[in-house]
Amino acid sequence: MLFRSLQPALEEFQPAKSVSLNEDELVIARNYFLLTMKPTIYAANVNEAALSATSDSEQLRAIREVAASEGAECIVICAQLEADLVGLDAEEQREYLESLGVKSSGVDQLIKSAYRMLGLMSFLTAGEKEVRAWTIPQGSRAQDAAGAIHSDIARGFIRAEIVSYDDLIGARTYATAREKGLLRLEGKDYIMQEGDIVNFRFNV
């Protein structure tokens, strides 16, 4: 039954996800792990001139139309530019992108798009020697986020001291952020937000 439903679309080179399936067929389809049932991100590799152009080329418009027809995102990326950025520090990267009229690198956009598609987000922990990003599902509680670091932190969870990335960058130091009341204490059921910087208080 499933493959009879899918056959006409596949013979026309249309993705399996374009076919409207009932609940029973969807359950069966998941067992086959069909590639064209999976969500898609289109990445269009262009040159630097096209990246900073005020209008899309005919080819790029066609890719965007295909992506839109599938409800997918289209990320425009310049592989040569990304290779050049690797050898630059953060400030040089920012200046280079600004000179091209580009807000963020294609790789950054691709990562963010993948996170959105997979329902993921990240939070940060920051110490004197290390800043680290942790990946968790969107909608995770603070205690679940603590468990992403270590099960003992989740088990002995007391409070989470949190400041947003933007607030800390604006304040420049933890001390200033604390003076301005930007740091806050949250309980285990706090829903984590993208870019939260967290210090977990725990006892085991």
Regions found by a protein language model. Give the residues of each.
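Phosphate-interacting basic helix/loop segments used at nucleotide- and nucleic-acid interfaces
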Residues: L21-I28
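A structural signal for well-ordered alpha-helices, especially hydrophobic packing surfaces
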Residues: Q7-Q14
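Short, small-residue-biased leader/transition segments that mark boundaries at the very start
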Residues: M1-L2
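Canonical P-loop GTPase G-domain recognition
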Residues: P39-I41, N47-G127
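Nucleotide-binding motor/catalytic cores of P-loop/tubulin-like NTPases across gene-expression machines
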Residues: A79, G87, E130-N199
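Short, surface-exposed secondary-structure boundary micro-motifs
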Residues: F202-N203
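Conserved catalytic network of the ASCE P-loop NTPase/AAA+ motor domain
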Residues: Y32-T36, A67-A68, M192
